[in-house]
Amino acid sequence: MLREVTISRAIIESYYRDLLNNLELDVAIVGAGPSGMVAAYYLAKGGAKVAIFEKKLSIGGGIWGGGMGFNKVVVQEEAREILDEFDIRYEEFEKGYYVADAIEVATTIASKTVKAGVKIFNMIEVEDLVVKDNRVSGIVINWTPVLMTGLHVDPLTVEAKYVIDSTGHGAQVAQFLLKRGLIERIPGEGAMWAEQGERLTVENTREVFPGLYVTGMAANAIAGAPRMGPIFGGMFLSGKKAAQEILEKLNL
């Protein structure tokens, strides 16, 4: 006989264990888009304890819709090895341009990331940062519906040696530092220029404040660099770069 209360208990107890197990992390990633998930995958493969916090119900960021709802994405030659790493199928459109199914990209990266040992917490929004001794040392979290409805509910905190802002165009995590005068400015992304946008996304992936990295479009927003549209190689390479640098700093 199926008992409703047993179903409830199974969900509550297993989620409770997951949350408790991820209150102290090597790396907390904010945003489960392409750069955030790729960073998490390589971090976990390298031995780091990592979790992703995504404010939306679904993960994947801007992958799903491809370009203008045509659910295909393009990846350039430099990032093709990451498609191979994730066993994502693709076809060559022209030399150096590879086309993949957006749904396969989103679901495969998510699945492989979770199977690498990453816990993804969806419907949890980061509303602030923990900053101690001039270093980011954790995130302040609350349920997305609580923040959406404006209810006065105090948050909880997660401790992390490093935090990655993978929130995309708004660089929402870095904004908390800007608001407190801990970084000088966030100019926002520039106009569309795919070639420069892709190159600079990787170049701008860095530690912008002790303990805080930026990846993907958040990296370009911090630097005022161009957007690039539905080409995702830069996102993937950005996530991998951040993971490699953090693993080195963690001595893993």
Swiss-Prot record:
Domain of life of the organism encoding this protein: Archaea
Reactions this protein catalyses: hydrogen sulfide + glycine + NAD(+) = ADP-5-ethyl-4-methylthiazole-2-carboxylate + nicotinamide + 3 H2O + H(+)
EC number: 2.4.2.59
Cofactor or coenzyme needed: Fe(2+)
Binding site for NAD(+): 35, 54-55, 62, 126, 152-154, 217
GO MF: iron ion binding; pentosyltransferase activity
InterPro entries: FAD/NAD-bd_sf (IPR036188), Thi4_fam (IPR002922), Thi4_prok (IPR022828)
Coiled coil: none
Binding site for Fe cation: 154, 169
GO BP annotation list: thiamine biosynthetic process; thiamine diphosphate biosynthetic process; thiazole biosynthetic process
Pfam families named among the record's database cross-references: Thi4
Keyword NAD: yes
Residues that bind glycine: 227
Enzyme class: transferase
UniProt pathway: Cofactor biosynthesis; thiamine diphosphate biosynthesis
Keyword list, A-Z: Iron, Metal-binding, NAD, Thiamine biosynthesis, Transferase
Classification via NCBIfam families: sulfide-dependent adenosine diphosphate thiazole synthase
Family indicated by similarity: Belongs to the THI4 family.
Known role: Involved in the biosynthesis of the thiazole moiety of thiamine. Catalyzes the conversion of NAD and glycine to adenosine diphosphate 5-(2-hydroxyethyl)-4-methylthiazole-2-carboxylate (ADT), an adenylated thiazole intermediate, using free sulfide as a source of sulfur.
Subunit structure: Homooctamer; tetramer of dimers.
Full protein name: Thiamine thiazole synthase
Organism: Pyrococcus abyssi (strain GE5 / Orsay)
Taxonomic classification: Archaea, Methanobacteriati, Methanobacteriota, Thermococci, Thermococcales
